Amino acid sequence: MNLLSKISLVMAAAMLSASFSPAQTQDPESGTASSKKYAVVNFSVNFMREQPEYEAELVDHALMGTVVEIVGKKDYWKQIVSPEPYKAWVNDMGLVEMDGDQLDQYIAAPKYICTAEYSHVFARPNRNAERLSDMVMGDIVRIWYRSNGEGSNIKQTKKNQEMFLGVILPSGRKGYVPKEDLEVFSEWAQTRNATVGNIIATAKLFLGVPYMWGGTSIKAVDCSGLARSVWFMNGILLPRNASQQAKVGDDIDFHPDYSISETSDEFKTEMKKRISYLKPGDLLFFGKRATADSKEKVSHVAIYLGGGKYIHSSQIVRISSLIPGDPDF
C-alpha cells in the first residue's frame, strides 16, 4: 500500500482545530444537562488509559496542545475524547479546562510546534534556568514572542532573542524554548512534503525508542504509534491502530503463494518475489489471513525502507529484514 501517492493529505492542523459541535450533554456526576467541557493537553505527553487507574491498560498518548472533550470524571481522573476520536482516561493535572469562548481563543492563537525530538521550556532564556516542562516532537504551544521580539512585553537581550523563543504553555505559564527546537505551526504545516525520503528520515529518528503498548510519541511507541507519528510529522493524519491503518490507501496487487512452507528452501525465493512488489515508504501489515472460521486479523505494522528492510516498533524501534536467512529476519 503506497500511502504517499494514494491517500489524501490531511494536514496536521486538524489535530489542533478539531472541534466538537456545541451541544448539551449530561454532567457525569449530577446527571443534569450542562454545556460540553473542553480541555487542552498540558503535559508533553499525557497517558490515556482504559480505566481511571494507573494499573489500567495504556491505550494512547495525547500530546501537548491537543484539544479534547471531557465526557467523564472520577476523582482526579478525567475521561476524554481525542480528535481521532479515542475515548480514554487521563490524569486531570495534564489538562487545562476551557469553555467554548476560551477554546475559540486558544485555537485562533498563533502557535509553535516542537520539531526537535526532545526539548524543554525554561523559566528564563537560559539553558541552566529552571525547567517548566519538557517537550517532545509534535507538541504545540502558543507564541509569546518570536525571535525578533515581536509580541514580547519584557526587555530581552539581542543574544537571547536569537537563541530562544517565547512560548505560552496551555496552562498560561510563559517560558523560553531554544529557537532551533520550534517552528511556527502555520508555516510548518504549509511546508509538509510527505516524500519517501522525508518519511524514512523521520522514521529513523525513532530508532532505539522503547516499545510501549499504546505509545504514540518519541518517548515510547507501539507499532501503529510509530507509523502514525511519522506520518503526522509529514502532514498526514493516519488512523490510530494498525487494523484501521490497513483500511486506508490501496492494497498492493500481487498473488503470494501461501502453499509454500516458511521452513522450506523455496520460501526465500517466494519472499524475494513478494518484496519485488514493494516500494520504500509502503506500510507493511502483519497478521493472520482470513479462514473459513475466522476473519483476517492485522496485528502489526511496519514501514518499508527498501532492499528487503523495514523499520518497526517491536521491543524497540529497529530495522529488520523480510529475507529469510538474514540475521535480522
Residue map of PLM features:
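Bacterial N-terminal signal peptides
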Residues: 8-18
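...with weaker cross-activation on analogous glycine-rich loops/strands in unrelated enzymes
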Residues: 239-319
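Bacterial N-terminal signal peptides that target proteins for export
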Residues: 1-9
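Active-site nucleophilic cysteine motif
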Residues: 203, 215-234, 238-241
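Boundary regions of SH3-family modules and the immediately adjacent low-complexity/disordered segments
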Residues: 24-36, 66-67, 82-113, 117, ...
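Beta-loop motif signature
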Residues: 31-34, 40-70, 114-155, 211
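Aromatic- and glycine-rich peptidoglycan recognition patches
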Residues: 97, 119, 126-132, 295-329
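Second-shell loop/turn segments in exported
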Residues: 128, 185-190, 210-218, 291
